[in-house]
């Protein structure tokens, strides 16, 4: 009975040492809390700055994707107005083509290229043997 009591006291003493040694077990001073609060405020400010920068970048990218508002397309339009090379009757037909070509070029530039192998997945049957699901072997 006495040994059980000693083991119990030893276990409680170890537990007390572990709890008091942990940072959450210590009493916090007002200075520590103030420092944590200021750190949190600075973190929130930097997050706000990052969000604002991302919003500006997204806005800038959206403005550049619009062919009517981009500076390069305005410059091209001004050059086209200064030097008419095509007769006025053929111009409406070619304007549609240039707008179409310009939009296709912008789509090519803005599109994210995906490298596909023609397979939408692969399945492992056994170790070392892989069978492709949905693979087009003719297109490879």
Curated annotation (Swiss-Prot):
PROSITE patterns: NATRIURETIC_PEPTIDE. It comes from the Eukaryota. One of its GO terms (molecular function) is hormone activity. GO terms for cellular component: cytoplasm; extracellular space. Its main location: secreted. The record marks 113-114 as: Cleavage. Residues 59-102 are annotated as: Disordered. Keywords: Cleavage on pair of basic residues, Disulfide bond, Hormone, Secreted, Signal, Vasoactive. It is found in: Secreted. Residues 1-21 form the signal peptide. One of its GO terms (biological process) is neuropeptide signaling pathway. Residues 22-113 form a propeptide. Residues 66-81 have a biased composition (Polar residues). Cleaved upon secretion to produce the functional hormone. Disulfide bonds join 119-135. Belongs to the natriuretic peptide family. Hormone playing a key role in cardiovascular homeostasis through regulation of natriuresis, diuresis, and vasodilation. Has a cGMP-stimulating activity. This is Natriuretic peptides A. It comes from Oreochromis mossambicus. The lineage of its organism: Eukaryota, Metazoa, Chordata, Craniata, Vertebrata.
């Amino acid at each position: 009975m006495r040994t059980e009591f000693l083991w119990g006291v030893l276990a409680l003493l170890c537990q007390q040492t572990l709890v008091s040694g942990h940072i959450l077990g210590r009493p916090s001073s007002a200075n520590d809390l103030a420092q944590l609060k200021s750190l949190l405020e600075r973190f929130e400010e930097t997050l706000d700055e990052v969000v604002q920068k991302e919003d500006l970048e997204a806005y800038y990218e959206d403005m550049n994707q619009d062919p009517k508002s981009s500076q390069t397309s305005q410059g091209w339009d001004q050059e086209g107005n200064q030097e008419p090379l095509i007769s006025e009757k053929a111009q409406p037909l070619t304007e549609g083509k240039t707008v179409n070509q310009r939009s296709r070029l912008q789509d090519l530039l803005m599109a994210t290229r995906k490298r596909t192998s023609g397979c939408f997945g692969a399945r492992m049957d056994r170790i070392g043997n892989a069978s492709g699901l949905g693979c087009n072997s003719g297109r490879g």
